[in-house]
Curated annotation (Swiss-Prot):
Keyword annotations of the record: Cytoplasm, Hydrolase, Protease, Serine protease
Enzyme Commission number(s) of this protein: 3.4.21.92
Subunit structure: Fourteen ClpP subunits assemble into 2 heptameric rings which stack back to back to give a disk-like structure with a central cavity, resembling the structure of eukaryotic proteasomes.
Enzyme class, spelled out: hydrolase
Organism: Xylella fastidiosa (strain Temecula1 / ATCC 700964)
Presence of keyword Transmembrane: no
Coiled-coil segments: none
Listed name of the protein: ATP-dependent Clp protease proteolytic subunit
Transmembrane annotation, as ranges: none
Gene: clpP
CDD domains named in the record: S14_ClpP_2 (cd07017)
Length: 208
């Protein structure tokens, strides 16, 4: 039994009383009804497809009501993360982001790209930014092509972080040279999140 199957077997079910009797949901489906999305684990194409589908579904249900994404991710594939980022920016509802545990690499970029004033972190969460990683073997010309692609991705990611944090491109480029870990408070000071809180905020309850 692989790790994914084991995890699915541990997902609790919630029973809800409706006018037609009892209805059982897995916990994530029930929370999706409350416009809560969970981005947990490495970001790959499969994860991106799930998140994008949920964002589009919630927009179709109510384009005026906020969506909340809880992030606990070590990062992952840049193109998969960019698919989520572009969808967050594209849809009409404001997307609030909340860091629980960690938001590293692409996870940090998605955390920072939430709606202005609606980006949160819990007090013991960690945020890490860095430049994209890459490794390629092959002919020299192919290696050169991939190296230029990594540099282009790095420039684009730096632009996005600068846009959402208010930091200069030069500062972002310098600060992402190596793994740069930040506490929740430091992430707020840097502009990656807007607020750190230890208790649920009234405005977050109302927005969900």
């Amino acid at each position: 039994m692989d790790d994914v199957t084991k995890a699915l077997n541990l997902v609790p079910m919630v029973v809800e009383q409706t006018s037609r009797g009892e209805r059982a949901y897995d916990i994530y489906s029930r929370l999706l009804k409350e416009r809560l999305i969970f981005l947990v684990g490495p970001i790959d194409d499969y994860m991106a497809n799930l998140i994008v589908a949920q964002l589009l579904f919630l927009e179709a249900e109510n384009p005026e009501k906020d969506i909340n994404i809880y992030i606990n991710s070590p990062g992952g594939v840049v193109t998969a993360g960019m698919a989520i980022y572009d969808t967050m920016q594209y849809i009409k509802p404001a997307v609030s982001t909340i860091c629980v545990g960690q938001a590293a690499s692409m996870g940090a970029l998605l955390l920072a790209s939430g709606a202005s004033g609606k980006r949160y972190a819990l007090p013991n969460s960690r945020v890490m930014i860095h430049q994209p990683l890459g490794g390629f073997q092959g002919q020299a010309t192919d290696i050169d092509i991939h190296a230029r692609e990594i540099l282009a991705l790095r420039a684009r990611l730096n632009e996005i972080l600068a846009k959402h944090t208010g930091q200069s491109l030069e500062t972002i480029a310098h600060d992402t040279e190596r793994d740069n870990f930040k506490s929740a408070v430091d992430a707020q000071a840097y502009g990656l999140v807007d607020q750190v809180f230890g208790q649920r905020q009234e405005e977050l309850i109302q927005s969900s």
